[in-house]
Amino acid sequence: GDVYKRQDGGIALSDGTRVLPDPFLVGRDPKKLQRLGEQYGIERWSTDLDAALKNKDDEVYFDAATTELRAENVQRAIAAGKHIYCEKPVASSLEEALKLYALAEQAGINHGVVQDMRFLPGLLKLGMLRDSGFFGRSLSIRIEFGYWVFEGDQQPAQRPSWNYRKEDGGGIIIDMLCHWRYVLDNLFGRVKSVSCLGTRHI
């Protein structure tokens, strides 16, 4: 998101001021980082997270790494005194997530997680219809979601394997149900219980 905000001239605040993000890309593949930097005009990139976290001028750490790497990376950023903005899921387990929350609170930093799907055009329209009384009283809500992932034999797979392979730290349930939780909370009410079935069709 920061990349596109930079191209648009920064983030507009309510008083008309514009804030221009100065991102520092950190990843595992230097060739990809260099290509992204050149493509979007970002000069700062590194494969060394700890070195990047030492820069006092960078106050906010945004984590969009794979789920299995996230908890450790966020913990290192908290220890470096950075404010945290994090993709979901925050961690692979409730225990890890609660530990990160406790560490962030103890450090006295601001911390939050992505809730981007709340602002998808279709869901905003759904909320508008709900508020207008279009549906009447909702007694039951059902959401179905799936990834269409090309197998790679006839055409290249279009999603990285960690998005959907449990053994790579992903899986549609851990990757997506946390997003649908806040969608349901904000559109229809608090979730009281969950029943879930995940399958893979080839």
Where are these regions (language model features)?
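Short active-site oxyanion
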Residues: L20-F24, E59-Y61, G170-G171
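N-terminal Rossmann-fold cofactor-binding loop
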Residues: F24-P30
